[in-house]
């Protein structure tokens, strides 16, 4: 889990003090390289973010990957402390300001992400989680987003109360679990000059595939993931409906038993006998534990994210399709003439 190595020293409450995240180009390239290397092995890439807070800006100046979970020869916390100690010796920012992880098929919201960010944010108040979408970035759209847990989500997780009543009281939904923080990438002037020169050296037939309609695999992956999430949400709904049916049946039996007891007590009273207290009947019906709704909330958020990505992707593909059709018709008309 990404909460490995999170420090346990609380600082002052700094909620809503991080207005934006500034990430150096070097840190971005290291994150991108690590995430793409792990995506080839179908693994989830995770790592630590290093930097500092300046005014209301969180500056990320460096990062390093976490060791793989299957590596039993390396202690995670010792590894992180050793890396930060070496960085400090060479005068590199070594303050732990968050963590990053890769995301596939454009969906990063999960129970593990929520739990890890909770541990980070309650021990390092200014920490953020940076999510890099490998699939979308491989199509030419750099997708790098920073998130923080909202105060309501932190309070709910702190109370460990994920019942429907808690969600209503705190007004928490899948759209209010995380707050997205604007992220900007900063490069040195020399880096910008080099990138401009590289752009001029790029062949004309490369890097301008704006009308590429490669929709099959992307749309298929999104649809498959959407169907899986809908099935999971259906199973959660079935479990909750069964709970409601059991509660309704129990309440009916309890009211029937109380009515019977009231009739018996009326007979006892008429005979001058002591009545039986209602608590004797109520004790026979133990309250059913309310199922947690956190998993269903996260699944709903995943469904919403997939639906948004599908709608956005389809609108872009349709626009490309109509443009391509117009160009093809113009080409055929020109050939006829």
UniProtKB/Swiss-Prot annotation:
It is found in: Cytoplasm. Disulfide bonds: none annotated. Residues 21-153 form the MPN domain. GO terms for molecular function: metallopeptidase activity; translation initiation factor activity. The keyword Cytoplasm applies. The keyword Cytoplasm applies. GO terms for biological process: formation of cytoplasmic translation initiation complex; positive regulation of Notch signaling pathway. InterPro entries: eIF3h (IPR027524), eIF3h_C (IPR045810), JAMM/MPN+_dom (IPR000555), JAMM_MPN+_peptidase_M67A (IPR050242), MPN (IPR037518). Belongs to the eIF-3 subunit H family. Component of the eukaryotic translation initiation factor 3 (eIF-3) complex, which is involved in protein synthesis of a specialized repertoire of mRNAs and, together with other initiation factors, stimulates binding of mRNA and methionyl-tRNAi to the 40S ribosome. The eIF-3 complex specifically targets and initiates translation of a subset of mRNAs involved in cell proliferation. PANTHER family: EUKARYOTIC TRANSLATION INITIATION FACTOR 3 -RELATED. This is Eukaryotic translation initiation factor 3 subunit H. The lineage of its organism: Eukaryota, Metazoa, Ecdysozoa, Arthropoda, Hexapoda. The gene is eIF-3p40.
